[in-house]
Amino acid sequence: MAACPELLDLPGVGVITAAQFIISWSHLDRIRSEAAFASLAGVAPIPASSGNTVRHRLNRSGDRQLNRALHTVALSRLQHHQETRAYAARRTNEGKSSRDIKRCLKRAIAREIYRQLQAHAKTANQEQHAA
C-alpha cells in the first residue's frame, strides 16, 4: 500500500480496510479534524438526551463503507488484540453494553486512523514541496 503503508501496521487493519480509509480520506484539506472524520464515518455519538437523562445514540448517517471498515477493524481487534479485549472487559465492568463498547471503540479507531492519515499527508506534502 504505497499511499499510506503506516496504516497496515495498526492492529486489525488489512489491505482492503486501509484502502477504504484512504478512499474516504481523499486528500489533506477534505477533513479538518478528527471529529469531522468520525462524523464522516458515522461513529461520532449523537446526543439523545431528554429531561434529566443524558444519553448518546449511534449515528446512522455518514459514509457507510467507511463505517463498515471501522467496524471490521473493531471486530478484528476484539478477537485478536489483547489491549482491546482488556478495554472491552473494563467497559463491561463499568456497565456498558456491547453496542456501546463497539461505538466507543470505533470512535477511538477513527481517531487513530485520522492521526495516521494526517501525519502521512503532511510528510508527503513536505517532501513534495522540498523536491
Task: Give each language-model segment a name.
Residues M1-A131:
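A detector of single, family-specific signature residues
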